[in-house]
Design a protein with these regions (language model features):
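Local sequence-structure signature of Cys/Sec-based thiol-disulfide redox active-site neighborhoods
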Residues: 12-39
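Non-catalytic, surface beta->alpha helical segment in thiol-disulfide oxidoreductase systems
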Residues: 70-90
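Alpha-helical elements of the RecA-like P-loop NTPase motor core of helicases
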Residues: 28, 53, 83
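Short alpha-helical
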Residues: 25, 50, 76
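Short, Lys/Arg-enriched N-terminal segments with co-localized hydrophobic residues
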Residues: 1-13
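Conserved beta-strand positions in the Rossmann-like core of class I SAM-dependent methyltransferases
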Residues: 42
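Structural micro-motif
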Residues: 59-68, 78-79
Length: 90
């Protein structure tokens, strides 16, 4: 998969959105992984009705959480995140 990155002061900048739900062990691991790499991300809580409805409208076939998007590209769940970070050299 190709990730479009912008290079700014201080190196590579990525926009990361993580869709999570409480009591989701893989969500916790994904967030810990991003934090351990020093990457900032925006968390979208699927326990919130409006977030859940908007997500399922855009991605009706996706049932697994977490769901991670890097620079507007869906990388999938935890395994997808791990592969994306490896591909990016992070």
């Amino acid at each position: 998969m190709l990730y479009f990155l912008s290079v700014g002061r201080g190196g590579i900048q990525v926009n990361i959105f993580v869709y999570t739900k409480s009591k989701c062990p893989n969500c916790v691991v994904a967030k810990q992984l991003l934090k351990s790499k020093g990457l900032k991300f925006i968390e979208n809580d699927m326990d919130t009705e409006s977030v859940r409805q908007a997500f399922h409208f855009a991605y009706p076939d996706v049932k697994q959480l977490p769901q991670i998007f890097i620079n507007d590209q869906r990388v999938g769940g935890l395994a997808g995140l791990q592969q994306a970070l490896k591909d990016l050299g992070l």
